[in-house]
C-alpha cells in the first residue's frame, strides 16, 4: 500500500530501471572502457617502436635498413613478465596477505584495505620492530618493555633492525612522524658560550656579608623600614597622580568655557540674525498698514488737496492786492479764482454725497442689527404673532442686501402695517431708556399697542 507505479515497474525484467538491466549496462560500459585502454596502450607501444626505428636509422644501423629487426626483438607481453621477475615478490603489510586471493581490480593496488573474515586488521606500523599491525606500546611487539639500549643490543644480532635513538628519530621523520621538542630537548653544543661556567661573585659582595652578620631581630627591623619607605613612595606617587588629574580637569574646564563662549557668540550672532528678521517683518507690516491707511483715508487726502487749494487762493489774493494797476490781469485772475472755487464746491458736494450715502447705509445696518437683537429677545419672552410676521419680513429684507437703501425704504413703507408701527414705537422707547424696563412694563406697552392698532383698523 502506498507504493508508486515506478516501484512496481522497476521489478519487471523488461523495465530499464530494474537491477538486472542496470547491472548489464554497467558491465557493458566497463568492457568498452577496458577495450579503449588496451587500444591506447597498443598505440603508445607502436609509437615507441617507431621512434626507436627512426633513432636507429639516424644512427646507421644496417638491420633496420634491411627490415629484419623484428626477428631480434621479443614479443610485447614478454617484457612485463621479465620486469615482474626482476622486481621480485611485493612486500605485503601483513602475513595473511601473501596467500590471500584477490580480485583482478585489487591485485596490483596495495592501497586498497582488505577486511578478511575473523582477522583484526590495524593499519599501523611499530617504531621498534617496524612491523605492521601493532604499536610499540602493545604487548604483541617482540621488543615491548625494552629500552632503546637493550633493544639495540637485541637487534645487533641481525634478527631485526637497529634500535638506536638517532636512527629511530631519522626513520620517524622519513615516515612522516615527529617528536616534540620537550622530548628531544635542546641540541647542546660544547662551544656554546651559554654553556660556559661563570665564577660566582656572591661571596665577595659586602652587602651579602653584612646581611649574614645581622641577627633575626635586626633583619625584621630592616624589613619594616623598607616597608615604610615603600609606603611613602606609593603615597607620593598617588599625590602626583591626583595633582595631574586636577590639572587635567582645570584644563578641561577652561576648554569648556572657551567652547561655551564661542557658542554664546554664535547664539548672539543667531539672535542678531533673528532681530534683523523681526525688523524686516516689522517693516513689511508697516508698509502693509500704510497701504491700508491710504485706502481708508482717501478722504483725508482730499481734505489736504482742499488745504492746498486754499493756499493757492491766498496767494492769488495777495497778487491781486499788489497789482492794482493791471485790471485785465485782475479780471483774468478773478475768473481763475471763480473756476477754482466752483471745482472745489463740486468736489465737496460729491464727497459729502458719498459720506451721506455711507452714513445712511451704516445707520440702516445698525438698525437691522438692533431689530434682530430685539426679535431674539421677543422670541425668548414669548412675543405676539403680529411681531413674528414683521420679523419674517425683516429677515427677507436682510437676505437681499444688494438692493439700494432708497428701494428698501420704499418697500418698507409699502409693507408697513399697524402692528409693525406699534412694535417700532416700542423699540424706540426701549432704545431711549436703555433697555431698563422690566417685563411687566413691556407687557403693558404691548397691550396698549395692540389696542391702538385695533382702533386704527376700525377707523379704516
Curated annotation (Swiss-Prot):
Biological process (GO), any one: negative regulation of DNA-templated transcription
Feature: compositional bias, Basic residues: 231-257, 445-460
Disulfide bonds: none
Highest taxon listed in the record's lineage: Eukaryota
Biased composition (Basic and acidic residues): 305-318, 325-338, 345-382, 406-434
Signal peptide: none
Residue numbers spanned by region Disordered: 213-460
Record bears the keyword Transport: no
Motif Nuclear localization signal per record, residues: 231-247, 288-296
Keyword Iron: no
InterPro entries, per the entry: CIR1, CIR_N_dom
Assigned GO CC terms: centrosome; nuclear speck; nucleus; protein-containing complex
Keywords assigned by UniProt, alphabetized: mRNA processing, mRNA splicing, Nucleus, Repressor, Transcription, Transcription regulation
A single GO molecular function term of this UniProt record: transcription corepressor activity
Subcellular localization, as worded in the UniProt entry: Nucleus speckle
Biased composition (Low complexity): 258-273
Role of this protein: May modulate splice site selection during alternative splicing of pre-mRNAs. Regulates transcription and acts as a corepressor. Recruits repressors to the histone deacetylase complex (HDAC).
Protein's name according to its UniProt entry: Corepressor interacting with RBPJ 1
Organism: Gallus gallus (Chicken)
Amino acid at each position: 500500500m502506498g507504493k508508486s507505479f515506478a516501484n512496481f515497474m522497476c521489478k519487471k525484467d523488461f523495465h530499464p530501471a530494474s537491477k538486472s538491466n542496470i547491472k548489464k549496462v554497467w558491465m557493458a560500459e566497463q568492457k568498452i572502457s577496458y577495450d579503449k585502454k588496451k587500444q591506447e596502450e597498443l598505440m603508445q607501444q607502436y609509437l615507441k617502436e617507431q621512434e626507436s626505428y627512426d633513432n636507429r636509422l639516424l644512427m646507421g644501423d644496417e638491420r633496420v635498413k634491411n627490415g629484419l629487426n623484428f626477428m631480434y626483438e621479443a614479443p610485447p607481453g614478454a617484457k612485463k613478465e621479465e620486469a615482474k621477475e626482476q622486481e621480485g615478490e611485493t612486500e605485503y603489510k601483513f602475513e595473511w596477505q601473501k596467500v590471500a586471493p584477490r580480485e583482478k581490480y585489487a591485485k596490483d593496488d596495495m592501497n586498497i584495505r582488505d577486511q578478511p573474515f575473523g582477522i583484526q586488521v590495524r593499519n599501523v606500523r611499530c617504531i621498534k620492530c617496524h612491523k605492521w599491525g601493532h604499536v610499540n606500546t602493545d604487548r604483541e611487539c617482540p621488543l615491548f618493555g625494552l629500552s632503546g639500549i637493550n633493544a639495540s643490543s637485541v637487534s645487533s644480532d641481525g634478527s631485526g633492525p637497529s634500535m638506536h635513538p638517532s636512527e629511530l628519530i631519522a626513520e620517524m621523520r622519513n615516515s612522516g612522524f615527529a617528536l616534540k621538542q620537550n622530548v628531544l630537548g635542546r641540541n647542546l653544543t660544547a662551544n656554546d658560550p651559554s654553556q660556559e661556567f661563570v665564577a660566582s661573585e656572591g661571596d665577595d659582595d659586602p652587602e651579602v656579608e653584612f646581611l649574614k652578620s645581622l641577627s633575626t631581630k635586626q633583619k625584621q627591623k630592616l624589613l619594616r623600614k623598607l616597608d615604610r619607605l615603600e609606603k611613602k613612595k606609593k603615597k607620593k606617587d598617588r599625590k602626583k597622580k591626583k595633582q595631574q588629574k586636577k590639572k587635567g580637569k582645570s584644563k578641561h574646564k577652561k576648554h569648556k568655557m572657551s567652547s561655551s563662549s564661542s557658542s554664546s557668540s554664535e547664539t548672539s550672532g543667531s539672535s542678531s540674525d533673528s532681530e534683523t528678521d523681526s525688523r524686516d517683518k516689522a517693516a513689511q507690516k508697516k508698509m502693509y498698514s500704510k497701504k491700508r491707511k491710504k485706502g481708508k483715508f482717501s478722504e483725508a487726502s482730499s481734505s489736504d488737496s482742499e488745504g492746498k487749494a486754499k493756499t493757492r487762493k491766498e496767494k492769488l489774493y495777495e497778487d491781486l492786492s499788489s497789482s492794482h494797476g493791471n485790471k485785465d490781469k485782475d479780471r483774468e485772475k478773478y475768473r481763475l479764482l471763480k473756476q477754482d472755487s466752483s471745482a472745489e464746491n463740486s468736489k465737496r458736494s460729491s464727497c459729502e454725497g458719498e459720506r451721506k450715502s455711507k452714513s445712511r447705509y451704516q445707520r440702516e445696518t445698525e438698525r437691522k442689527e438692533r431689530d434682530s437683537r430685539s426679535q431674539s429677545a421677543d422670541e425668548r419672552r414669548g412675543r405676539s404673532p403680529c411681531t413674528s410676521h414683521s420679523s419674517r419680513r425683516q429677515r427677507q429684507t436682510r437676505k437681499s442686501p444688494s438692493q439700494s437703501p432708497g428701494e428698501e425704504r420704499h418697500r418698507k413703507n409699502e409693507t408697513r402695517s399697524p402692528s409693525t408701527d406699534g412694535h417700532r414705537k416700542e423699540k424706540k422707547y426701549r432704545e431711549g431708556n436703555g433697555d431698563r424696563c422690566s417685563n411687566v412694563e413691556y407687557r403693558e406697552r404691548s397691550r396698549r399697542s395692540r389696542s391702538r392698532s385695533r382702533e386704527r383698523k376700525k377707523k379704516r
